[in-house]
């Protein structure tokens, strides 16, 4: 793990403190932050890069499903874990359809909590690695294309290069739309 930020949101200060203490103690490489309002935390989530968000599903001022949608709109890859007071199949279905990463039911066992948060952090880390690798690959391809353009130009084969470049761009557009 690499000093990942985790945001815990709960309006119950005792549970918020307990969850934060547990994660700080057991996930020493994670930077744990807390908030007592899901609605107020949306601005924080917009401006700070988190590896995971753990939120009580029953928040005043914003329901869990709209909260998950708002977070996913800002950061589509950010894992949002919801804590439910009791099993609620309808809410679970709606939350998962909105993009929730994991649903946990209180009281959640420490091992289950740690496993879920660790997995969310790892997913964030892997997604970041993939994003960096894609950027490096794109830069390498663009560099090679620039070299090819120079070579084709030097040998008077510019029209062949333009046809090749058109097919590469079409292929790139098709793969990004998937």
PLM segments and residue spans:
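Receiver (REC) domain switch/output surface
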Residues: 26, 113-125
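Short amphipathic alpha-helix used as the core "switch/output" element in two-component signaling
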Residues: 43, 65-77
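C-terminal output helix
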Residues: 90, 108-117
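Acidic, metal-coordinating helix/loop segments flanking the phosphotransfer/catalytic sites
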Residues: 34-52, 62
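Two-component/phosphorelay signaling modules centered on CheY-like receiver
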Residues: 13-33
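C-terminal output/effector regions of signal-responsive regulators
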Residues: 135-178
